[in-house]
Regions:
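Conserved beta-strand-loop-beta-strand hairpin that lines the nucleotide-binding pocket
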Residues: 2-22, 27-41, 89-199
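STAS-typified acidic loop motif
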Residues: 38-52
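Charged, alpha-helix-enriched surfaces in structured cytosolic catalytic cores
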Residues: 49, 70, 164
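Conserved short strand/loop->alpha-helix "switch" segment adjacent to the catalytic nucleotide/phosphoryl-transfer site
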Residues: 56-80, 153-159
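Functionally constrained cores in energy, signaling, and assembly domains
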Residues: 79-82, 115
Length: 199
């Protein structure tokens, strides 16, 4: 994980900025009622001890959506890995905080987990490369890569080698993981990771 210099006065604005992005990130015209829509949204600073609480809220929301138990487990697993990825690689401000927004949405193509945060530019570039590599693999190749990393250990310096969490996420999404990074500013850039869990 990298740290970088940034105007300290801007750090207090990170969470409000994420809140604004969350409000503007949903598809236009999405109805509030009916089967589809946002089931869970969270914006704030994140620590390891908040993960169980987020999962509990996500599980309750999924239970009311009518999804199967098997599907719920897959969605919760992807949610865990998305948040853990932020904890491990997110930008840490001088106060020691990591800002995050997380949404869980039920869409016509499946459940979507959207996770947004700030990252140091070098970390964002490395994550983009890992996600791109995983998206190029089929399920059998992902399984082989998972076993290789599990047996040989994670070597983040190897090109194309991703951590077990990201590999597991890719295996469960049954589709490409979307990764969007905005232009960097002061060595930090906003990134959004979206994973779709198909029925």
């Amino acid at each position: 994980m990298h740290t970088c210099k940034m105007d300290h006065s801007k750090h207090t604005e990170l969470v409000p900025m994420l809140q604004q992005r969350l409000r503007s990130s949903g598809p236009e015209g999405t109805p509030l009622g009916g089967r589809y829509g946002i089931l869970l949204s969270f914006t704030g600073t994140v620590e390891r001890d908040i993960v169980p609480h987020l999962l509990q809220l996500a599980e309750r929301s999924l239970a009311t959506s009518g999804c199967s138990r098997k599907e719920m487990k897959r969605v919760l697993f992807v949610t865990i890995e998305a948040v853990q990825n932020v904890i491990h690689h997110g930008y840490i401000d001088p106060s020691g905080d990591i800002a995050l927004y997380l949404t869980l949405e039920n869409t016509p193509i499946g459940f979507q987990v959207h996770c947004g945060n700030w990252m140091a530019t070098s970390d964002a570039a490395a994550l983009s490369e890992r996600v791109s590599h995983l998206n190029s693999l089929n399920h059998a190749q992902l399984r082989k890569l998972y076993i290789d990393v599990l047996c040989n250990g994670e070597q983040s310096g190897n090109q194309g080698n991703a951590g077990l969490g990201l590999i597991s996420m890719a295996k469960r999404t049954r589709g490409p993981i979307e990764f969007v990074a905005e232009p960097p500013k002061d060595g930090v850039q906003h990134v959004t990771l979206t994973a779709t869990i198909e029925p």
